[in-house]
Amino acid sequence: MLKALFGDPNTRKIKKLQPIVAEINLLEEDIQHLSDEQLKEKTVEFREMLDKANNDEELEDILEEILPDAFAVVREAAKRVLGMRHFDVQLMGGMVLHQGQIAEMKTGEGKTLVATLPAYLNGLTSRGVHIVTVNDYLARRDAEWMGQVHRFLGLTVGLIQSGMNPEERKKNYACDVTYTTNSELGFDYLRDNMATAMAEVVQRPPNYCIIDEVDSILIDEARTPLIISGQVERPTEKYIKAAEIAKQLEKQESEEDPKDYEVDEKARNVLMTDQGFEKAEQLLGVGDLYDQENPWAHYIFNAIKAKELFTKDVNYIVKNKEVVIVDEFTGRVLAGRRWSDGLHQAIEAKEGVPIQRETQTLATITYQNFFLLYNKLSGMTGTAKTEETELEKVYNLQVTIVPTNRPSQRYDFPDVVYKTEPAKWKAVAAEVEEMHKMGRPILVGTTSVEKSEVISALLQQSNIPHNILNARPENVERESEIVAQAGRKGAVTIATNMAGRGTDIILGGNSDYMARLKIREYLMPQIVMPEDDNLMAGGMGSNNRRPQGFGQDSKKKKWQPSADIFPTDLSPETQNMLKEAVKFAVDQYGQQSLSELEAEEKIAIASENAPTDDPVIEKLREVYKLIRKQYDAFTDKEHDEVVDKGGLHVIATERHESRRIDNQLRGRAGRQGDPGSTKFFLSLEDNLLRIFGGDRVAGLMNAFRVEEDMPIESKMLTRSLEGAQKKVETFYYDTRKQVFEYDEVMNNQRRAIYAERRRVLEGLDLKEQVLQYAEKTMDEIVDAYVNPELPPEEWDVENLVSKVKEFVYLLEDITAKDMEDMTVAEMKIFLHEEVRKAYDIKEDQVDKVRPGLMREAERFFILQQIDTLWREHLQSMDALRESIGLRGYGQKDPLIEYKQEGYEMFLEMMIDIRRNVVYSLFQFQPQGQPQAV
């Protein structure tokens, strides 16, 4: 109705962008005539304009003003360097990103290229732009590939990879544009906020961020907290005692028969009754399970959970006197993984095996809150419209659908549903065989490794050659190799959970990728440094971070792609040229002298058109063009054949919990106006149907006496499936929303404490801050012992004075007599003066040992207290959150209670930090100084 009245809001947004696109297109001709130097000069001009801004608002205005010119410059640079020209729709995508929105662009519409536009524009401010991808490999690929555009135009480009040291990280974060992964960014932020000196801090303040595959990071991983933890000592006897008590407590089966605790299977939680609390307190001989000095509640709750909700040989097994978790989804043993919050220890106590140490959270943040730290946040994805409400409510991000460059020619067949899973797999295999005979490329999507092996076995029986893609990290590079070939005639690819986003399936095969692989095969063994022998022997070591987790002879396997990947053998002339180019590279750089990253970068630059003054790259580029030309002759011909046959056929073997992920799989077919088709094969035994309403459908099938291998296709069924998916999505959304609301409380506290910490790190002279701490502490002591409502003779000045001396031994000479005729305000002023004098004396004593030592001590003690008390506070907040749920029974809103109590706890922590710092500094006795008598 509203759409009919006002038109589609998305269409209106796109309409607004069209005049700017027209302006950029008009500029194109002038900019084409500029020399490379003149084009680079543009960056200097833009920066001079931006330097005139006096505040952030003016800066944004200037960015808006130069946008058409800047985008036109990037388009021209990309044309010269990469041989790629931004389409009009890509310019629109760039504008959407610059506005701090999410651009929904279909697969194959060149999202990676779109990011260069807003990254360049915002990179001009020198405040830093972060481009975030889901894994190290994609970050590296984009930094090498798209980074050339920025480098050509004079911006600096950084790359963060796991395993880099702090110096490298700092250098890369200081660049104008930095490519990285979400986890590296988050952990660097947490580590920066544990640094003890400014020199250790690697990141700059978060400015602008572009997230690739934004839905998977902001939604699928939003609930995942990033945690840095350390080990703590906990009394093991408490776990053992709690396990004994849990054995004596009884489970309540019904309201009529009250017992000690109830079990909520669905929420996997236990609730103790009043009777249970009394019984536990009696057995322990304590007055209150929640006593701050001697808390027992956490241990008892965990012991009951261990008894009721965790079953041996189902949730865990006991092996070599250790409790090992079993993954409920795959049934695999998760060695080395432990349940948190003392639960693992409770299960160890229940099983009577040695109790291992608990870990304590030192710093934590969720992705939701981390990305909200940026001044401007934007993202790209092929599928975000389904999650639009969540993105808008939580992140204040709007979704704009950017039109495709060419209309889609994909056909989606209706779903077919079988009665049993085996019948479904048989039908899938038959469909693959039929399409394979026609010569169409086929992509089969499965939801687990195990299922991909089922279908693989069926295809082997029919002698159909195929490739399997699993989400194992060692397959990442091989994955791109397979995906690059998945569009060849008759190719069959089985992929699990849509692994391998990032490389497009090009019909007829990806000749660019094949040509690069060919060069890699010859160049890498000659030019890359061999790994450390001892690391290679174990097959792991630093090697587990490599894209391929091969063992000892990994290099041979690594640079040698599978033989059938190349469409044709190279002509002898080309082969000789390739060998000569490799020999030239070895002569120039030295035998096995480059790191793998450096060598990859050389190949990446050689396969683009970026200007270069490296003679090796020039030689490699000549060879690349020749190889590519030979391969193109085959892939172009094959492309046309595949298009005639109907393009890529995608077979999905299960509906995913989220419609978005189904759409991603469908989006693999029919990219950039190519033809393609998709079809979902389902069975009543699939998870989604089984959990959400499969019985009804099964009843129907039995009533109609449907044969095992007869599919049913019905609109009603498709609708009920979508309904089930919506239910699941809402369920997960509610969970995320709740996590977010609670975490928001922690987030405000985290911001405050980290801001205070950063002030201390940056402050050169913290003396004034410590003196303020000391004065505040004196005020608090006066307020604690003196009540202005009472007559002065009833004031407890004696104890007040002894308390002051307890904190500051240098005030030994003060007596109650000195203060007896003073008002409260006068007392405070008097103590302020005394404590300042005492501090000067202390400073002289300390600086005698070494000049400037007091300044170092101030910083050290403040940071130490902030870190120690913040760690303890994180635990108290966790405990509060665990127990707060019970408030719901007392007609109170648990969230409001959590906010209030959390705030009070935070204020107490801040007071403790102040007092401890004052006490520690006055007690500080550096070595080499005579002790105070």
UniProtKB/Swiss-Prot annotation:
Location of region: Disordered: 539-570
Keywords per UniProt: ATP-binding, Cell inner membrane, Cell membrane, Cytoplasm, Membrane, Nucleotide-binding, Protein transport, Thylakoid, Translocase, Translocation, Transport
Catalysed reaction equations from the record: ATP + H2O + cellular proteinSide 1 = ADP + phosphate + cellular proteinSide 2
Protein topology in the membrane: Peripheral membrane protein
Enzyme class of the recorded protein, top EC level: translocase
GO molecular function: ATP binding; protein-exporting ATPase activity
GO cellular component terms attached to this protein's record: cell envelope Sec protein transport complex; cytosol; plasma membrane-derived thylakoid membrane
Binding partners and assembly: Monomer and homodimer. Part of the essential Sec protein translocation apparatus which comprises SecA, SecYEG and auxiliary proteins SecDF. Other proteins may also be involved.
The protein, known as: Protein translocase subunit SecA
Gene encoding the protein: secA
